[in-house]
UniProtKB/Swiss-Prot annotation:
Name of the gene encoding the protein in the UniProt record: gcvH
Species of origin: Mycolicibacterium gilvum (strain PYR-GCK)
A GO biological-process term: glycine decarboxylation via glycine cleavage system
Record lineage: Bacteria, Bacillati, Actinomycetota, Actinomycetes, Mycobacteriales
Name of the protein described by the UniProt record: Glycine cleavage system H protein
Gene Ontology cellular component list: cytosol; glycine cleavage complex
Cofactor: (R)-lipoate
Chain ranges of the Lipoyl-binding domain: 24-106
Co-factor binding details: Binds 1 lipoyl cofactor covalently.
Length: 131
């Protein structure tokens, strides 16, 4: 079974979301997703200050098997991208919940609370991937 940390929230699209501040979150793809993708060879991320809309594509992860879209877990502004992925995209495979993070997003805390409440907790995500 894939690693599913209890302290994160999860989307149906196999992304994790971690609150990092009152109005910020860090986003990445799950261990389940990186295992399904295989060896990641390229990650396309948005620019800092880009406006993302919940449910819409904001980038791509390319592996030796396929290209998969990344979907925004909430409507927010990009405040940081993981520049290490440009030269080391395999970090998504080796450390999906740590060094392989994708973007940091900022939204007002009320909309952030509402968006996070709609995501899976670890147990809910475990059920989602088991289906």
């Amino acid at each position: 079974m894939s690693e599913i940390p209890a302290d994160l929230s999860y989307t149906e699209e196999h992304e994790w979301v971690q609150r990092t501040g009152d109005d910020t979150v860090r986003v990445g793809i799950t261990d389940y997703a990186q295992a399904a993708l295989g060896d990641v060879v390229f990650v396309q991320l948005p620019d800092v200050d880009a406006a993302l809309t919940a449910g819409e594509s904001f980038g791509e992860v390319e592996s030796t098997k396929s290209v998969s879209d990344l979907y925004a877990p909430l409507t927010a502004k990009v405040v940081a991208v993981n520049g290490d992925l440009e030269s080391n995209p395999q970090l998504v495979n080796s450390d999906p919940y740590g060094e392989g993070w994708l973007v940091e997003l900022q939204a007002d805390s009320a909309s952030l609370d509402a968006a996070l409440a709609e995501l899976f907790d670890a147990e809910g995500y475990r059920g989602h991937v088991a289906d």
